[in-house]
């Protein structure tokens, strides 16, 4: 099973930092998200409103295998 991941994460410069994932996903949020909000469109565009002290790993694979 894939763990939580986030490609676009923003953090404040405070200590500890306050980070939020700004990814938009179809119909769901990452697996660790507690506050997931989705639009009423089809498919739903969902974003996670959680504030954490860290960023999850990026979702995109590190290797360029999109050929």
From Swiss-Prot:
CDD domains attached to this UniProt entry: BBI
Signal peptide start and end residues: none
Site, as annotated: Reactive bond for trypsin: 13-14, 40-41
Tissue: Seed.
Molecular function per GO: serine-type endopeptidase inhibitor activity
One Pfam family matching this protein: Bowman-Birk_leg
Disulfide bonds: 5-59, 6-21, 9-55, 11-19, 29-36, 33-48, 38-46
Gene Ontology annotations for the cellular component aspect, listed alphabetically: extracellular region
Transmembrane segments: none
Keyword annotations from UniProtKB, A to Z: Disulfide bond, Protease inhibitor, Serine protease inhibitor
Tree of life domain: Eukaryota
Oligomer and partners: Monomer. Although dimerization may occur in solution.
Functional summary from the UniProt entry: Inhibits trypsin but not chymotrypsin. The inhibitor consists of 2 domains and has 2 sites of interaction with trypsin.
Family according to the record: Belongs to the Bowman-Birk serine protease inhibitor family.
The protein's name: Bowman-Birk type proteinase inhibitor 1
Annotated organism of origin: Dioclea glabra
